A protein has these predicted regions:
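Solvent-exposed loop/turn and edge beta-strand elements of beta-rich ligand-binding domains
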Residues: 1-198
């Protein structure tokens, strides 16, 4: 309670609301530390931060309102310097007024691995191409597929890159080859994201 005297000047300082953006990072290969994010505000502000070992990055003390524009600030959250093996996640736009009571907004980002496919087209002189077994090995993984009656087998959604962002070389081998055939030599292949290699 203030007791005011006539012609007394009173100064009032407003403390503008501040909030927090919390980023939760997950990845298909489980590597979530040191992922870099940029938060850009519609008021021209810009901040960058990296995730901790748990895949969390927090931007605190962010202004909620643009006083000049008389509106809530829209923040754009982007993952930057995304490593080659991942698809780049879409940026997200948030306002802190849409967050919790304490003006905290949580944004979830997932690193999906770039993947491709291998298509096997089995051919033989007697056209007996169905039910042939192949193994495909690479990056410490082994996959087994079997051809259909048309001699076709497709292995889909396998990683293009390893954790060092190097292209994985896959080795393709035919197994259980009937004795009447000469065993074909192994073949190798590298993949392109979202494409099929024959």
């Amino acid at each position: 309670v203030f007791a005011l005297n006539a012609n007394k000047e009173v100064f009032v300082t407003e403390d503008f609301s501040r909030g927090t953006i919390k980023i939760n990072k997950t990845a298909e290969d489980g590597i979530v530390a040191d992922r870099e994010f940029k938060v850009t505000g519609s008021d021209g502000s810009s901040y960058t931060k990296k995730t901790n070992a748990a895949g969390v990055a927090e931007f605190s003390g962010l202004k909620v309102y643009d006083v000049d524009a008389k509106t809530a600030i829209t923040y754009t959250i982007s993952e930057i310097n995304v490593e080659t093996r991942y698809e780049t996640p879409k940026a997200q736009n948030v306002t802190l007024t849409s967050g919790t009571v304490d003006l905290t907004v949580t944004a979830n980002f997932v690193n999906e691995l770039k993947t491709g496919s291998i298509r096997i087209n089995k051919q033989s002189e007697d056209n007996q191409n169905g039910d042939r077994t192949f193994t495909i090995t690479g990056n410490g993984e082994t996959y087994t597929i079997t051809t259909g009656a048309d001699g076709i087998a497709i292995l889909s959604d396998i990683p293009v890159y390893n954790s060092e962002n190097e292209k994985i070389e896959y080795t393709i081998s035919e197994k259980d080859v009937p004795i009447r055939y000469v065993v074909p030599a192994n073949q190798t292949a590298t993949l392109t994201a979202d494409a099929t290699v024959d």
